[in-house]
């Protein structure tokens, strides 16, 4: 029997509060898969696998809507391939579509192409945004259904649910036919979002002394980082969070750097630490963007940094413009260093002070140009010579992946991984979830690895144990295959 709108609204509120009447609601902190976080009370785990995934919420919701007659199958993207029964209708997400409360939102394009993502419309919103109720947005599969404002990225379909006749439903209204994708902006225009994270950082008590310019070692844009991190919670932030994330035309202010610290330099929070003294900004997409696109992302960071330096009364110099590698052993900012000095810290090790100064001086010049002229242009180093950004550049930054007979993608990589706040089950001999268990990698443990693999929906690192065993440890989820794979949130910190 169809539910009334009032009943639907009550159900959604109960999901959000963690009090819904469901046999699949987690009653107390629970964990059976160390690949994910510990599920909190209120999380929905409808199938008993992989903790509280996004689809678990929909499986429970549809069972309730259909009086336990329809149980969904497949991943999130598969929901538009099946029928839930009478009264359910599948709609393509068009420019004129304003969803109604209770509808199911299905994401199948862009970064959601591999498995999809899914949630429930909590507030239909408008053309630009709506409020979604969802699970597993943070990748840890550990939270109860949570509300988040979404911008329609990757959303391809809505599933309309049946509503009992005679109830009041929010009327669909016409909206402008403008594309949900923001129109290209002028080069000098930056959109700055101040959608701060849902955690209060320690206060510095004074303005920052300067800016640390990072490379994100990821594939997301500034806006995508905002979507995934704004409500991620402490467990994710403890693995590292910067004040700002910049890409072409867009900067997300995750934390107000004027008086709050961030965890971006990895050297603690003491009065002399980089975390305490400096603001931090990530140049985004350092592992996925073309050289041309990455340079545009850098320009957004330089322009924004110039604005902040004016606000804070700072002059760009070697004391105020800093590199992550000045505080701890790391290759960051690896992509910028390759482009502007010709030195690759990933393959060549730690650079000399002269090379670091060369990169800092380039950053300083770019920031000064924006402060003095309001504009600047990129230059890169190619074959030892400086050239304009129009010079073709095709340097691979992700290494050469190979595929073995078992379908595992692998490549050599020498680095260090520091586990987060949850133990991880390791495997012996191969990167498969059904391989022999090697034990638990404790929370906070450090391992030095020499190989990276992609298999079974995860990214693994490989290393030799003291007893001679070859051990593989999953360190994040992964969608797709190289070179277009999309890594999930890391379960620790790479150095």
UniProtKB/Swiss-Prot annotation:
SUPFAM superfamilies found in the cross-reference section: Cysteine proteinases, N-acetylmuramoyl-L-alanine amidase-like
Reaction(s) catalysed (UniProt annotation): Hydrolyzes the link between N-acetylmuramoyl residues and L-amino acid residues in certain cell-wall glycopeptides
InterPro entries: Amidase/PGRP_sf (IPR036505), Amidase_domain (IPR002502), CHAP_dom (IPR007921), Papain-like_cys_pep_sf (IPR038765), SH3-like_bac-type (IPR003646)
Swiss-Prot/TrEMBL keywords: Antimicrobial, Bacteriolytic enzyme, Calcium, Cytolysis, Host cell lysis by virus, Hydrolase, Metal-binding, Multifunctional enzyme, Protease, Viral release from host cell, Zinc
Region (Disordered): 378-398
Boundaries of every Peptidase C51 domain copy: 29-160
Positions with a binding annotation for Zn(2+): 214, 324, 332
Entry text on domains: Contains a cysteine-histidine dependent amido-hydrolase/peptidase domain (peptidase C51/CHAP domain) at the N-terminus, a central amidase domain and a SH3b cell wall-binding domain at the C-terminus. The CHAP domain contains a tightly bound structural Ca(2+) ion and it is present at the N-terminus and is associated with the endopeptidase activity. The SH3b domain increases the CHAP domain activity.
Descriptive protein name: Endolysin LysGH15
